[in-house]
């Protein structure tokens, strides 16, 4: 980003340099105001047509975590419901990958649902597998073609999935 600003300043010496104000990353519950950005992030991360508006109806304070930088949604994690505790989506905006956002969102979901097993499916070649392993998730099943109906045939992502479970007794 610094190189873009420097290029702009060289190209436009008459303009005053912009003052950048940094802000903390905040974590909050999913709200209707976030939905457009969340849907865009999930489409970029997974596939088109994802709609998580119904997550607002199922205890969003226990089942959703949204990471914000100022008003920009930079991450989202969603459980299907407090009873089922299945992670349907966990995504971080491109460029924010090494900011520990996924780690914090996963940590929050686990803490919001104590004593409940948490399950998820992850693409067999997804690097998020390392994150889940660090939290203690264990592989239960390998499912061939799990993502076949969702992924573009040209996608480098594996169409096979591994079902993982975090046991919390």
Residue ranges and their predicted role:
Residues 29-32, 41-51:
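Helix-loop element at the rim of GNAT/NAT acetyltransferase active sites that forms part
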Residues 111-124, 131, 143:
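Conserved GNAT acetyl-CoA-binding A-motif
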Residues 1-32:
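Conserved N-terminal entry element of GNAT/NAT acetyltransferase domains
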Residues 46-95:
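A conserved beta-strand-loop-helix scaffold within acyl/acetyltransferase catalytic domains
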Residues 1, 35, 84, 103, ...:
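Generic preference for well-ordered alpha-helical elements
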Residues 3-6, 119-121, 138-159, 163:
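Conserved catalytic-core motifs of GNAT/GCN5-like acyltransferases
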Residues 98-111, 130-134:
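Conserved acetyl-CoA-binding loop-helix of GNAT-fold acetyltransferases
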Residues 93-95, 99, 124:
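Active-site acidic-Proline motif in GNAT/NAT acetyltransferases
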